[in-house]
A protein has these predicted regions:
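Conserved beta-strand segments of the P-loop GTPase G domain that flank and frequently precede/overlap
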Residues: 24-25, 54-59, 82-85
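Mid-chain, well-packed structural core segment of small domains
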Residues: 64-96
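Flexible, glycine-/basic-rich loop-and-beta segments that form/coincide
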Residues: 127-140
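Long, charge-dense
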Residues: 87-90, 95-100, 104-128
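Short acidic low-complexity segments
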Residues: 41-51
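N-terminal, charge-rich interaction modules
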Residues: 1-34
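Glycine-rich, highly charged phosphate/nucleotide-binding loops
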Residues: 37-43, 58-69
Length: 140
């Protein structure tokens, strides 16, 4: 039985109203429009500090060079989605993306279809490496 996927793209990517989002090398007017409908905190290029979600387009191994510099720009519970071609037209292997992300201290924890031609892999800071927050009701 074929499953019908109806989850909107921004929901798959975890982009909620009011989030700080950055687009890097994503040339897609439709995704810009969808994000702008959901949040006003959208930048293109270098992410602002404490960014919630970065969408980072990469087509070749050399395109991954900025990835280690993005990790410090996201919130501790934020995410960097690496968007690349999928299938036979892929010009970047999953292992190549994973190697660069791991060297930057990130782990992968989700893959999503970004479009008919592109896939997205989510990278996050491991929970064990995130700053500890005070227990609810307690102040530091």
């Amino acid at each position: 039985m074929e499953r019908v996927y109806t989850t909107p793209l921004l929901d798959k990517l975890g982009i909620r109203p009011g989030m700080r989002v950055a687009l890097i090398d994503i040339d897609d007017p439709e995704i810009r429009r969808l994000i702008a409908e959901r949040t006003t905190d959208l930048t293109e290029g270098e992410p602002k500090p404490e960014t919630d979600v970065v969408l980072f387009g990469a087509e070749a191994p050399a395109d991954l060079e900025p990835l280690p510099m993005l990790a410090p720009r996201i919130r501790p519970n934020g995410a960097i989605w690496v968007v690349s071609r999928k299938g036979k037209s892929a010009t970047l292997r999953y292992e190549e993306i994973l190697d660069v992300a791991k060297a930057a201290g990130l782990i992968d924890n989700k893959v999503a279809a970004f479009s008919a031609t592109h896939t997205a892999v989510r990278f996050v800071i491991p929970v064990a490496l995130r700053p500890k927050s005070p227990a609810p009701g307690r102040r530091r």
